[in-house]
């Protein structure tokens, strides 16, 4: 019983400190309305458990992020939540989205599976740290399968997609099985050029609603 209580308290502390990631412990204590002594004690326990890394600021380890993803998955299942929100800022991509979305193999599959013809390009969004647990949660879901294909010269990998909405634009988040993007960058496709329709520029903060 004591072990179960300790585990629950550790997870509760992890959730709290994840919300102030990047801050020094003293500043985090103020934000969380905790005493400095209590905050340092909790951080010490989380570091010993492997959930936080050593250093001058609060920083989750991969183990800590994985634990949050499990908590999130269980909460979403319990509350029967049908969508999640991803928040980030518009960034310039690598230029690959236009090429891949113009390929007939992907275009036809997206028309078939998602019901729209994609604009030849993707909107790249660099996620805020608070959205990374949601992003990793998507990794564990099947999503909508966009099959890979070959054109006789090259093989193109499969893509996992989730229907999504950005402001008034309906589209999809796409997660290629092969990508050069870091985990904190997500790609959004739509039947229109989203930057033009919504008047977006690099650095603009956006919110994506992703349907599960």
From Swiss-Prot:
It comes from Pyrobaculum calidifontis (strain DSM 21063 / JCM 11548 / VA1). Keywords: Flavoprotein, FMN, Kinase, Magnesium, Metal-binding, Nucleotide-binding, Transferase. CDP binds at residues 93-98, 192-195. Binds 1 Mg(2+) ion per subunit. Disulfide bonds: none annotated. This is Riboflavin kinase. Pathway: Cofactor biosynthesis; FMN biosynthesis; FMN from riboflavin (CTP route): step 1/1. Pfam families: CTP-dep_RFKase. Belongs to the archaeal riboflavin kinase family. The keyword Flavoprotein applies. One of its GO terms (biological process) is riboflavin biosynthetic process. Residues 84-212 are annotated as: Riboflavin kinase. Its EC number is 2.7.1.161. InterPro entries: RibK_CTP-dep, Riboflavin_kinase_archaeal, Riboflavin_kinase_CTP-dep, Riboflavin_kinase_dom_sf, WH_DNA-bd_sf. Catalyzes the CTP-dependent phosphorylation of riboflavin (vitamin B2) to form flavin mononucleotide (FMN). GO terms for molecular function: magnesium ion binding; nucleotide binding; riboflavin kinase activity. The keyword Nucleus does not apply. It catalyses: riboflavin + CTP = CDP + FMN + H(+). Mg(2+) binds at residues 122, 124.
